[in-house]
Amino acid sequence: MYKVLLVDDEALIREAISENTRWKELGYELMGTCKNGREAIERLDQEEADLVLTDICMPYVDGMELTRYLYEKHKGVKVIIISGYDDFEYAKTAVKYQVMDYILKPITAKELAQTLTRVKEKLDEERFQRSDMKRIRGAYMSNLPILRGRFLNSLLMGNVGAQEIQEKLKDY
């Protein structure tokens, strides 16, 4: 399950999305809602989310400022913007901060579910790659003593060139 934070200054929008989205079926857990970006930042500094759904126009800290903050401070958090503004500048900024999707209001539950499904596939892929890298790193670390031993044997037997020695010294 991926944790989602919903950020929108309109209570009706927060309520509609919260209640009409089948979070668990889609592989998500709604960790909460916030009415502006400032509240979201405070929440995200306390508890990590995997995905933030945010509006753009909100008081105090708007959705673009929130997106920039997440891009700079919480690199792993993905963002979907749900906005009533069809402005090219917003879209350009969203691309700059690697927003996963930019959805225009009004949005149906079906459209949101399709978007969440696509994003979940990307999140699953990233999670798999991280776990695969972790597994490979673990295997390398457990075999490192053997690799060092083989290298030492090669050194003692004189089977290693100067350049290979330099490369192996960096690795081991």
Model-identified regions with their sequence ranges:
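Interdomain helical linkers/hinges and coiled-coil/dimerization scaffolds
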Residues: 107-172
